[in-house]
């Protein structure tokens, strides 16, 4: 499973159209369709009813919250990494002493 497949899945859930989801994702409709088909193959079944409207199947409904959480966590990880690499990360306090410890 790849992140772009998850993003396309979520876009298709929102748009309910392969053409609109592809446009929203910045890819061609055949690329989005191929990615969704590969995801369906990996998960073992159809995620969407394609006719008359694009709607989630039972399997699609079952995996939706998990794929959505993966996307949310990936975004949080990206934000945390950017914060650290741009100097906005967690701070560490370091204490030193000018006195030496006596003999043990």
What would you call each of these model-derived segments?
Residues 59-66, 104:
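Short amphipathic alpha-helical coupling segments at ligand-binding clamshell hinges
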Residues 42-43, 63-85:
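Alpha-helical linker/hinge and terminal dimerization helices associated
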Residues 15, 24, 37-46, 78:
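Residue cluster at the C-terminal edge of the helix-turn-helix DNA-binding motif
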Residues 40-58:
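A short LG(V/I)-centered, amphipathic sequence patch enriched
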Residues 19, 53-56, 84-90:
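Glycine-rich ATP/GTP-binding catalytic cores of kinases/NTPases
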Residues 1-31, 35, 63-68:
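N-terminal short secondary-structure element
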Residues 19, 48-49, 101:
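Nucleotide phosphate-binding site architecture
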Residues 29-30, 79, 85-104:
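N-terminal winged-helix
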């Amino acid at each position: 499973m790849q992140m772009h497949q998850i993003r396309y899945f979520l876009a298709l859930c929102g748009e309910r159209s392969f053409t609109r989801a592809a446009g929203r994702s910045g890819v061609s409709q055949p690329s989005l369709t191929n990615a969704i088909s590969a995801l369906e193959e990996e998960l073992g079944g159809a995620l969407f009813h394609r006719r008359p409207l694009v709607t989630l199947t039972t399997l699609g409904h079952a995996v939706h919250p998990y794929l959505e959480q993966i996307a949310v966590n990936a975004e949080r990880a990206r934000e945390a990494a950017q914060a650290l690499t741009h100097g906005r990360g967690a701070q560490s306090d370091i204490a030193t002493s000018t006195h030496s410890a006596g003999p043990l």
